[in-house]
Amino acid sequence: MVKCTPLLALTVIVSAGSDALSDPTVKRLAKLATINQAPATQSNSDSKRVLRASDVPNEVAAGESRSPKSLWPWEVEDKLAPLKEKLISTSADDLEAGGSAKKNALPMTWRWLWQNQIETKKTPIDEISKEVQTAMDLISSKATHEELNKAGVSVSDYVKALKLTLPEVDVDVVNRGMEYNIHLGNK
């Protein structure tokens, strides 16, 4: 009998495709794949651990609280979304605190950036301004907000560049970008 490991379960789910998510067997495999197992007693035995029947969470009635073990991947993403938005958000009040114009205040949430970068991706490369290209280069090199300010990058150019480079930018860089926006607003 083949033991179902999380890797095997994920492999089967990926092979089955998204249309198969309604199948009860695929749902069960998805649960097996998302279980958060307790750490093994020996470090070298981590790779040898397999799921037991007792590891599989029982179905929970609607309205009841659910263990983190039984969360689907998209439910985990939904729970993390507010944290991401808090991490990468700047409000009109933040920018206005330094007496800056309110026009610089943008809804800079993770979801907003992610959705809007898709449209910006359609911009032909020859239509990207020199200023935006400079900002993109600085973002890629993880420039500090002082370096961005010295290069004369405006908030709007920075936002355009950020939307174009978001898939390749790590959270630390995006964080620095938000600090840069606030820095400009407080000048």
Swiss-Prot record:
Stretches of the chain forming a coiled coil according to its record: none
Region forming the signal peptide: 1-20
UniProt motif (RxLR-dEER) ranges: 49-66
Subcellular location(s) per record: Secreted; Host cell
Keywords in alphabetical order: Secreted, Signal, Virulence
Annotated domain remarks: The RxLR-dEER motif acts to carry the protein into the host cell cytoplasm through binding to cell surface phosphatidylinositol-3-phosphate.
Family to which the UniProt record says this protein belongs: Belongs to the RxLR effector family.
Further comment found in the protein's record: ATR39 has 2 polymorphic alleles that are highly conserved among Hyaloperonospora arabidopsidis isolate. This conservation is in stark contrast with other characterized H.arabidopsidis effectors ATR1, ATR5 and ATR13, which are highly divergent. The presence of amino acids Glu-168 and Val-169 in ATR39-2 blocks recognition by host defense protein RPP39.
Protein name listed in UniProt: Avirulence protein ATR39-2
Organism per entry: Hyaloperonospora arabidopsidis (strain Emoy2) (Downy mildew agent)
